[in-house]
């Protein structure tokens, strides 16, 4: 797949503070790439440099192999969607969507045609005459997205666009955004701190921490094979166990809990159940390993977990193939 954007040893300093040390990243044309990390990790700064709202202190940004460090945002064939929609309150949906084209002096007939298609793709046709105050948060976000895609950008940049919405609406819009990206076939670069959001929508995920890239991979690769201690603790739930000089990660769904009579492998350790949590269709057991004093998490079905009570002595263990060695 062709690389549309290249980030080559880019750094960003604010005064004497290094926000992003040398960082390199290739972004493929037509992919849904998510930059994921905690607050303050540098993900929004990276996005703003790609968009042209921040200038790299060092390094180069390339679009189609052309250097764009000094190219203004409006010449980059990119559009940015923020968490705060910045809609014009006195304009209806259609006029908000057409505003950028009007400023660019796009012919009125073409404005109408392109706005119609953008509203169709974002399911806004029936709301075209409403003003923002008469729209829900999700509908306002759709207007912001329609306003961005109506310009036919090569790349759509999204900075935590669903952060202000409630849980159900966020889930609905996650599916809509992924479907929209598939239909448009353009590159989406999406910034979020929400790992579930990243997992559900992305073709690839870039995990950032303190300005560095910790790991790049598909959602399955990031989840099943975390490379570093940070990724293992940030993505999903993991049991982190010391192994010689390093650490291994074991997902709770791979940890087995057996009665003393059912001990299967000699590697299983004696432990006792400290707590049991109901988590929907599963129960989460917290087992204190008597040998290592580690508190381990294990998932079981409600039927499997029904045999246990807090304080029960059990054996706990896992298959060696389920261990992931961490850097």
From Swiss-Prot:
PROSITE patterns: ABC_TRANSPORTER_1, ABC_TRANSPORTER_2, POTA. It is an enzyme of class 7 (translocase). GO terms for molecular function: ABC-type putrescine transporter activity; ATP binding; ATP hydrolysis activity. ATP binds at residues 37-44. Its main location: membrane. It is a peripheral membrane protein. PANTHER family: SPERMIDINE/PUTRESCINE IMPORT ATP-BINDING PROTEIN POTA, SPERMIDINE_PUTRESCINE IMPORT ATP-BINDING PROTEIN POTA. This is Spermidine/putrescine import ATP-binding protein PotA. The lineage of its organism: Bacteria, Bacillati, Bacillota, Bacilli, Bacillales.
């Amino acid at each position: 797949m062709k690389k549309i954007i290249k980030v080559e040893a880019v750094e960003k300093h604010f005064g004497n503070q290094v926000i992003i040390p040398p960082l390199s990243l290739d972004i493929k044309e037509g992919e849904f790439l998510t930059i994921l990390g905690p607050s303050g990790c540098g993900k929004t700064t990276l996005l703003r440099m790609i968009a042209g709202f921040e200038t790299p202190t060092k390094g180069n940004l390339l679009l189609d192999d052309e250097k764009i460090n000094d190219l203004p945002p409006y010449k980059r064939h990119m559009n940015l969607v923020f968490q705060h929609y910045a809609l014009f309150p006195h304009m209806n949906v259609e006029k908000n969507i057409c505003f950028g084209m009007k400023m660019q002096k796009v012919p009125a007939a073409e404005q109408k045609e392109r706005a119609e298609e953008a509203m169709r793709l974002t399911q806004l046709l029936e709301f075209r005459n409403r003003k923002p105050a008469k729209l829900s948060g999700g509908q306002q976000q759709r207007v912001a997205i329609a306003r961005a895609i109506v310009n036919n950008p090569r790349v759509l940049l999204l900075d935590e666009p669903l952060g202000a919405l409630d849980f159900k609406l966020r889930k609905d819009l996650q599916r809509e955004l992924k479907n929209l990206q598939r239909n448009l076939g353009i590159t989406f670069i999406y910034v979020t701190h929400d790992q579930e959001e990243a997992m559900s929508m992305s073709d690839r995920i870039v995990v950032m921490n303190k300005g560095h890239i910790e790991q790049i991979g598909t959602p399955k690769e990031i989840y099943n094979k975390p490379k570093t201690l940070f990724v293992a603790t940030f993505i999903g739930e993991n049991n982190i166990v010391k192994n010689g000089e390093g650490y291994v990660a074991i997902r709770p769904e791979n940890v087995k809990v057996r009665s003393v009579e059912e001990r299967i492998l000699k590697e299983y350790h004696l432990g006792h159940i400290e707590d049991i949590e109901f988590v929907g269709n599963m129960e989460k057991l917290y087992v204190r390993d008597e040998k290592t004093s580690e508190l381990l998490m294990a998932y079981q079905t409600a039927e499997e977990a029904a045999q246990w009570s807090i304080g029960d002595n059990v054996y706990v263990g896992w298959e060696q193939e389920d261990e992931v060695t961490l850097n």
